Amino acid sequence: MDHTSPTYMLANLTHLHSEQLLQGLNLLRQHHELCDIILRVGDVKIHAHKVVLASVSPYFKAMFTGNLSEKENSEVEFQCIDETALQAIVEYAYTGTVFISQDTVESLLPAANLLQIKLVLKECCAFLESQLDPGNCIGISRFAETYGCRDLYLAATKYICQNFEAVCQTEEFFELTHADLDEIVSNDCLNVATEETVFYALESWIKYDVQERQKYLAQLLNSVRLPLLSVKFLTRLYEANHLIRDDRTCKHLLNEALKYHFMPEHRLSHQTVLMTRPRCAPKVLCAVGGKSGLFACLDSVEMYFPQNDSWIGLAPLNIPRYEFGICVLDQKVYVIGGIATNVRPGVTIRKHENSVECWNPDTNTWTSLERMNESRSTLGVVVLAGELYALGGYDGQSYLQSVEKYIPKIRKWQPVAPMTTTRSCFAAAVLDGMIYAIGGYGPAHMNSVERYDPSKDSWEMVASMADKRIHFGVGVMLGFIFVVGGHNGVSHLSSIERYDPHQNQWTVCRPMKEPRTGVGAAVIDNYLYVVGGHSGSSYLNTVQKYDPISDTWLDSAGMIYCRCNFGLTAL
């Protein structure tokens, strides 16, 4: 014998053993051998083994091992479970398979829910989700809510919202309660081409049983984004619909909507901001602060709606600032660092900030949050894995390469690995779980790019841009990073480049119609919106959007204010 060979072995037969065990137990059940429990539903008797049922069902385990009378019984009667469903559950316990169809799922899911068999319950929910259509999604939503199937309920609700125009024509829609209907039409994610669709859906629902339902008109009309309707539509509505004309609350709602169109100052009110929020967010741009002149530091904030190509004003910043970082986390806008300017007679005081402000779209208010560990202007800011990163910048004395991140759960800033070089006036972006720090100044104009891997807490250099850039815009779409505009130390730029992380190379795209420095950039629906900035001769409020598919530029409505070195984000 070769003494170098192992003298033992461990044979792993788990899969074969499990299969053989299940087959053996199932044969015993089918032949009624060693069975110690009978499950009875009406006249149907199902033979089984307590230990097998208890191993897959906490309900049966509690029944057979607890202090219940069934512990000693050899027969248990069920009155609230369908016999076919119970047979399917027992079959699953012995085989690991279960047959789910449109005919069986409505009885099988409640049985699996009662008996606490999570795997079967999960498969029933997945099957129902795969069957969603405009005619059954409301019923499935109610069914899921009844049995506490949260994921299925959310999926059905999402389907209702995404397919609302088809759903609102089905029989299930007309059988909704007014409370359920109000919940649906209040949803920000309702997918409608225009708000007119929402109104017509409500009108149809009321007319289905007008005597009983007209009392709910005012409540439901309050959930329609009336300011998004045209003046012509609102006027025609008042003239043609006697139910609205005869109701004081409805008339007030229409008057408030008309004020939005005829009284621009009314648009700054909290309620108007909420009622003009587009459906299917995130679909808006938010422009914050910046400069509109050499000494003009802005606190104003405005929002752009692509649906009607228009801007409205929002609540101003607590601290006027420019050259700050901006991002969105949990549908709230964060403004970080920057330069705050305090103008007094004969003197202008500039302060490099470490302060943080957060805008809540639900209340249209700004609140102060925990300050960064370092003051930073001209910094980069991104969100990765639910945490907010502040990179580099300038503190008033030194260019920075340090990086810190904000952890919302503990409300603290913590340092992470610094960049390989100091950077200010640069851009930061997230792509494929990596943070990119692009270009900037430190203390020379740069075209270099580095990438942070959070799993390693380390940075590495990647391909450099074609142009050196400071104060430029950045956006991520279609798996690429796009940079646009800025200044190269000699001139203002109109150029745009695209980075492919798989090829690790930059490609020059079609330039903008005019150069821009201190520009804002953000992505909506795979368009790169390029906003404001400075052309080299004037501050800009103009907006262009870039279509990467056709490599073309289109004009959009300009901002209310000219802005440079400001914050722009999509939410």
Curated annotation (Swiss-Prot):
Keyword Transport appears in the UniProt entry: no
Record's signal peptide: none
Any single Gene Ontology cellular-component annotation: Cul3-RING ubiquitin ligase complex
Keyword Repeat: yes
SUPFAM superfamilies: Galactose oxidase, central domain, POZ domain
Pfam families (alphabetical): BACK, BTB, Kelch_KLHDC2_KLHL20_DRC7
Domain of life from the UniProt record: Eukaryota
CDD domains recorded: BACK_KLHL28_BTBD5, BTB_POZ_KLHL28_BTBD5
GO MF term list: ubiquitin-like ligase-substrate adaptor activity
Kelch-type repeats, residues: 284-331, 332-386, 387-433, 435-479, 480-526, 528-570
Gene Ontology BP terms: proteasome-mediated ubiquitin-dependent protein catabolic process
InterPro entries assigned to the protein according to its UniProt record, in alphabetical order: BACK (IPR011705), BTB-kelch_protein (IPR017096), BTB/POZ_dom (IPR000210), Gal_Oxase/kelch_b-propeller (IPR011043), Kelch-typ_b-propeller (IPR015915), Kelch_1 (IPR006652), SKP1/BTB/POZ_sf (IPR011333)
Record keywords, A-Z: Kelch repeat, Repeat
Residues of the BTB domain: 35-102
Protein name: Kelch-like protein 28
Record organism: Homo sapiens
